[in-house]
Amino acid sequence: MLASDGKRIRVKEGTPQGGSASPLVANVYLHYVFDLWAQAWRRKRAHGDVIVVRFADDIVLGFQEKADADRFRAELTERMRKFNLELHPEKTRLLEFGPLAIDSREWRGEGKPETFNFLGFTHICVMKRSNGRFTVLRQTIRKRLQAKLNAVKAELKRRMHEPIPEQGKWLQAVVRGHIRYYGVPMNNPALALFRFRVGWLWHRALSRRSQNGRVLWDRMRRLIARWLPLPTVCHPYPLRRMIPTPTTWPTYQTLGWWFSTWLGLWT
């Protein structure tokens, strides 16, 4: 490891926090510690269907059988211990999720299925009003949305005296990048809220620098329409392209089974 004073330090374990190589090294490490082991466990020890999704150190697993989820969690805890790793006690949880979860929890009087956060989205079980079919609603995590708005507010303060076209180009890139990541079906309200709040922050910044008082909203609406992109869906529903469908199962049946699972969330 190269220290800030230029000295080289030999590190026997772990990776330096904040180092450019740390995510790469950690990902390679988890590939052998978790990925290969989880795939082998799914093939040899699972009784029902199992899906595994990992991004860096955030992992979501879906189980058709709750017994599989319980056994996997216990064995994963033991395996992590062998490599001096541990599951996050607050972020590791098991929850019932899917179309059958809605009916079974309602029958037991337990209310709606729990939600979970993954990759910036809150995942929610819902039934569409248009056709009554089950779908997974993905909404921008509120804390992430507010954190981004706080960052925009701070940067606008720094850029307060820049020409409006320069501010507009920067805000355009910010809003477009946000939409390109969070632009999924049924997340339009959160996208529209982000765009509206960015426009409101911009209006406040321009009003503070104006010698004539507040900028009129008629002018501000034209600036917003000129520079801030409208919300749009950039990523269609991933179910058909992401879920492996055995040739002997109809597509609708496959989707029902995959999301009639107990989800174990590990970090």
Question: Residue spans of the language-model regions?
Answer:
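Non-catalytic terminal/accessory segments
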Residues: 1-267
